[in-house]
């Protein structure tokens, strides 16, 4: 699973996920991308499931870029634990994904294969997504 090697502080507050993404709203590396249409947390397990489904669909051809990384720790208290006694232990890691962010990119394969791989990846995610294509500055593909 993806997780940071080390962090300055083990635990974080939950925060809010509002607004649009500040960057990464265009496809930069590949030819096709999977864009988030809602804001949400994406867990490390969900990212890995998407990666595996894309790798199996592409069958060792083309390239995959993952543009999100789970760097936010999520804590939870044990079942049957009473209130108080401090914050719970770190249970997993999530990536904060805002609306409009391109999460995954694929390049080096034909259009049908890329779309099929991104559709499989989108089915593993808890948010609505859209498949987007890369546009050059001149307006041509």
Swiss-Prot record:
A GO molecular function held by the record: structural constituent of ribosome
A Gene Ontology cellular-component term: cytosolic large ribosomal subunit
GO biological process, one term: translation
Keywords from the UniProt entry: Ribonucleoprotein, Ribosomal protein, RNA-binding, rRNA-binding, tRNA-binding
InterPro entries (alphabetical): Ribosomal_uL16, Ribosomal_uL16_bact-type, Ribosomal_uL16_dom, Ribosomal_uL16_sf
Keyword Ribosomal protein: yes
Protein family: Belongs to the universal ribosomal protein uL16 family.
UniProt xrefs under PANTHER family: 50S/60S RIBOSOMAL PROTEIN L16, LARGE RIBOSOMAL SUBUNIT PROTEIN UL16M
HAMAP family according to UniProt: Ribosomal_uL16 (MF_01342)
Reported function: Binds 23S rRNA and is also seen to make contacts with the A and possibly P site tRNAs.
Assembly information from the UniProt record: Part of the 50S ribosomal subunit.
Name of the protein this chain belongs to: Large ribosomal subunit protein uL16
Lineage: Bacteria, Thermotogati, Thermotogota, Thermotogae, Petrotogales
């Amino acid at each position: 699973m993806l997780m940071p090697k080390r962090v300055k502080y083990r635990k974080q507050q939950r925060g809010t996920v509002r607004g649009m993404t500040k960057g990464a709203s265009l496809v930069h590396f590949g030819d096709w991308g999977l864009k988030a249409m809602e804001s949400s947390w994406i867990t490390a397990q969900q990212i890995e499931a998407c990666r595996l489904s894309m790798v199996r669909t592409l069958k060792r051809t083309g390239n995959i870029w993952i543009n999100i990384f789970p760097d936010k720790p999520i804590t939870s208290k044990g079942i049957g634990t009473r209130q108080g006694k401090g914050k719970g232990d770190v249970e997993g890691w999530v990536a904060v994904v805002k609306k409009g962010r391109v999460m995954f990119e694929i390049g080096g394969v034909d259009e049908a294969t890329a779309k099929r791989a991104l559709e499989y990846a989108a089915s593993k995610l808890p948010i609505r997504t859209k498949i987007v294509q890369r546009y050059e500055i001149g307006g041509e593909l």
